[in-house]
Amino acid sequence: MEEFDRSISFDGRDIRLKLGLLAPQAGGSVLIQSGDTAVLVTATKAASREGVDFLPLTVDYEERLYAAGRIPGGFLRREGRPPEKAILISRLIDRPLRPLFPHWLRDDIQVIATTLSMDEEVPPDVLAVTGASLAVILAEIPFFGPMAAVRVGLVGDDFIINPTYKEINTGDLDLVVAGSPDGVVMVEAGANQLPEQDIIEAIDFGYEAVRDLIAAQQDVMETLGVKLATLDPPPVNESVLEFIKTQTADEIKKVLSQYDLDKNGRDTALDEIKAAKVEEVIASLPEEDPIKVATTEEAKLVDTLFKDVTKKLMRSQIINEGVRVDGRQLDQVRPISCRVGLLPPRVHGSGLFCRGLTQVLSIATLGTPGDAQELADDLHPEDEKRYLHHYNFPPYSVGETRPMRSPGRREIGHGALAERAILPVLPTQQEFPYVVRVVSEVLSSNGSTSMGSVCGSTLALMDAGVPIIKPVSGAAMGLIKDGDEVRILTDIQGIEDFLGDMDFKVAGTDNGITALQMDMKITGLSMDIVAKAIEQARPARLHILDKMLSVIDSPRPELSPYAPRLLTMRIDPDMIGLVIGPGGKTVKSITEQTKTKIDIDDDGTVTISASEAEQAERAKQLIHNMTRKLNEGEVYVGRVTRIIQIGAFVEIMPGKEGMIHISQLAEGRVGKVEDELAVGDEVVVKVREIDNKGRLNLTRLGIHPDEAAAARKAAALL
């Protein structure tokens, strides 16, 4: 392909597309650039593999620190495993791409986005999403595109497209909208308790910009003479399909309307129908029977068509009767139960949230500022995280066995969503200096575990005494769309997620929304449907919130007795070196004396943590004495550190030393300093003078007994 360069003027900032310049052996490659942020996106297809019955799509987002002019840390000085942010961007690219491939496509597809250059203003993620669409089209992979994505921010009262990092961090909204010509395909957002109507307007605003980017891609395609690749669906074996319908439809309907069955009971009943009404009957057919021949040649044909029949019957029941497989109405939430303080107090806070068969146990742990997660090895401007949420999904939660491995992309993504939902209601660092980690253990899963983690996190935080601004709850909305018939489902369970068209997670407080995530299985939704889903989620969220507040209605006034006790103080930044001491000697001495942990920020904020408040107070007093301004005439108890011919040096507090001249050791003439003092002696001294260089001249003369007694008493408290 010849080189092609096109600049798109887009909302006051150019987006530049370079095609045919890099990666010539990739199926399709696009270098997409805005400002000094440039992302190379490639798409490559391989032939389908035998036995694959799903879309084998892999999306990887890669960060290189050279993009920001940096060299990686560590011994190897090379990028290691992708940071969490890179994994989340991989998912962000994947989610709007996946529904736009024909679901019958079985070719291996790999999309790789690599950030080659990055400035401090333009995030690379939405560029990568848009670039992925064009790369797939150029690779001639069947695709219902083009697709594009933009970010929407809220600065003051105005929505803006593709805000800078600074505008994102200071605004009340960080929303990514992706869309196709058919409508909205993906939404992801964090918001500062914004009303539903504001969110709807923001999505609509973003989709209008998405349409401009889609039109720009279509213009590029027309210029290059590129058309969308297509792939006809494989023929359906109508005779086998009709056989399965005839054999099972009535029985499946009975199971789907047997509302007292739980997930496991329903799955078992459906498996029994398939075995008795299909598999056993086929086994009894003559070898030459066309049904037996077809199902023998294609091993997974029965499973595939039985699932299709079940899917159509479930969807038909919802559309025509307005009743779901568990008997709920379309807008009804499953039964909810909550508990707090379930675990012993060694755990700082815990909350158990149950919704139907979904059960999530969330545990909150309070840590010190030194426990914050440093983010130095990625390209993004955030330095550290003070709130961390980790989501675990063990195999037993769905009654399965499989090897236990490190968290996968799904677990990282669900954890990040629940983390994002809570962030807007956390107290500031000044109000609550603790670093907080919440771990959500999914103990049983039947849909909406990420929103269960949001609810469990809220319960655990309040149980731990974290003064959150407002409690947060969440619900997952689903969709059944058949032509013009549309049904939106509240609080979807596993089968509705699996056989439905949408998973739209909405979290927030009674004031407004804090997080959104919408994923589709169809090629796009109109804004009317998106708006209705958001509006229908509100009463569900508030219902869930009422259930949670009936168990604990506000954060506990006291922390767990096993949580660390923190004290904060401010010192002059110029004094930081004094407190730390050479090689950390001084601060280490204080921590050892007081059995505390001390963290010092560059702005002079000192955070002291200890298991007991008295220990923290003692360390605070030591640091205060070290850093406060000394005055002439003040009396201290010190210890002799060294002796020279003309006097002795005395440390009156960690890191602060003064000298007693030989003439100030005693009344009358002193022949040798050693006649009066030895190294290690405790001595009461007065500050006689502070010279213009800040040096302390001390004396043992003229100290009243009451002054000496007060100094000894103060020293004893330390």
Curated annotation (Swiss-Prot):
Main location: cytoplasm
Keyword Cell division tagged: no
Known catalytic reactions: RNA(n+1) + phosphate = RNA(n) + a ribonucleoside 5'-diphosphate
SMART domains for this protein: KH, S1
Subcellular location field: Cytoplasm
All residue ranges annotated as the KH domain in the record: 564-623
Cellular-component GO terms for this entry: cytosol
Binding site for Mg(2+): 497, 503
Ranges that cross the membrane: none
Enzyme class: transferase
Domain S1 motif: 633-701
PROSITE patterns found in the cross-reference section: KH_TYPE_1, S1
NCBIfam families: polynuc_phos, PRK11824.1
Family: Belongs to the polyribonucleotide nucleotidyltransferase family.
Function recorded in the entry: Involved in mRNA degradation. Catalyzes the phosphorolysis of single-stranded polyribonucleotides processively in the 3'- to 5'-direction.
Name of the protein in its database record: Polyribonucleotide nucleotidyltransferase
Source organism per UniProt: Gloeothece citriformis (strain PCC 7424)
